[in-house]
């Protein structure tokens, strides 16, 4: 298969192919333009993969540009986080990082040009009055009483805005287009507003700041962007994008193309709702492993490869749809099944004593790090007479479908011996505290000599060598597929989205590195937490289970 045949195909790539074939463009230049007012989420990952992926595949360029036109909501913390996320996903921007604020001088000049052409005016209606005058989808707007000011008056008033002569909300610059337009975005949109706030890039140089719709198209043109890719909610804004560029003296006119945004089940991606989750402490922060943020997914144990594969699988269309969470989980499960080394950890431990094993002694059992990849090597795991097993792996009585340890019956310990449960010890409440067993000494990693069949296999950890670990069982943040549609999305937070257990792990995990994934055999995929784990306090996050338990629960 050729490189071209291996590329994904979608309507945007078809447009690019045609543009290159006809000579409309000789190269491809895209951009990823986030506003630095929050952390990136999985929806942004789709746009990152699209814009940077196209530039990569067509040997073009992709800019990282911060749409930093609202100093009140933006912070350098978000700038650094976004840069880190883009790089972590495996992409590199062309040249230096760009900022819309780099172009504030040019943007101001273009605003003055529109005023000189009679296409912009200073309006002194209040924000509420502007909304009232704008009309509705069913009713046209009406002209502002300030709409017909002279060019000279507008120039003077705009300079007064720039020099701080108006209070916030007392004046703005509006485009003069058509208050009766069927498209509300074209009803004399605001181009500049007043904000007395220090900007993280320009300091206090400006007290007027351009709006997104005015800034975005001009920034694209100044950077020589050939294909400006936006999500579908900006479809109507394309009319304003083109109007601005058509009415200023700028030689380049990029084209905007829209694609569907990513909607994902069992989460929300509204920045307002995500911020509410954080500020009201329903989650631990923007990087909480239950959040759909890239930093949250990374902390949970998702790999950049799995997120890129997910974005590739869902594709790029113009049709809005909601993607099943199982699709994202499947991508990380496949990745980690292929690449994660194996280890043993007991999440809900109960003591098991092998009475006929030499007491006080131990031996090393050799275990493969991956059952299908001998090149990943092996490790030695200590075994002794007292071990921990998972409480769910033992029953006093069970039917034939139960393939684990049952009183009076046998089971194999993973890569070790066959044992038989002989008796149990219980506390005053009737809870099993210890299981007493015997072992067949001639069954270390082999079948019994007499040919008897032992079907079940369970994992274990030597009690004398076990590492105490905190295990955080993360699950979907919401209990319904579309929490955003609920009257109160906070009311459908999944109460089981985080369950914390105290368990034991094999000693090799003392060397675990933050973020490195492991398959805890028979349990799921886990990684060492980057926030809470220390050398003396090991905390592991569940990335995803071995199988989709939500699908089974819904059947």
Swiss-Prot record:
Catalytic activity: tRNA(Gln) + L-glutamine + ATP = L-glutaminyl-tRNA(Gln) + AMP + diphosphate
PROSITE patterns referenced in this protein's UniProt entry, alphabetically: AA_TRNA_LIGASE_I (PS00178)
Region described as Interaction with tRNA: spans on this chain: 317-324
Cellular localization per UniProt: Cytoplasm
Chain span(s) of sequence motif 'HIGH' region: 34-44
Keyword NAD: no
Binding, ATP: 35-37, 41-47, 231, 261-262, 269-271
GO cellular component: cytosol
InterPro entries, alphabetized: aa-tRNA-synth_I_CS, Gln-tRNA-synth, Gln/Glu-tRNA_Ligase, Gln_tRNA_ligase_bac, Glu/Gln-tRNA-synth, Glu/Gln-tRNA-synth_Ib_cat-dom, Glu/Gln-tRNA-synth_Ib_codon-bd, Glu_tRNA_lig_a-bdl
Motif ('KMSKS' region): 268-272
Binding site for L-glutamine: 67, 212
GO molecular function, one term: ATP binding
Enzyme Commission number(s) from the entry: 6.1.1.18
Enzyme class: ligase
Record-level GO BP terms: glutaminyl-tRNA aminoacylation; glutamyl-tRNA aminoacylation
Family matches, as Pfam families: tRNA-synt_1c, tRNA-synt_1c_C, tRNA-synt_1c_C2
CDD domains: GlnRS_core
Annotated keywords: Aminoacyl-tRNA synthetase, ATP-binding, Cytoplasm, Ligase, Nucleotide-binding, Protein biosynthesis
Similarity field: Belongs to the class-I aminoacyl-tRNA synthetase family.
Protein name per Swiss-Prot or TrEMBL: Glutamine--tRNA ligase
Protein encoded by which gene: glnS
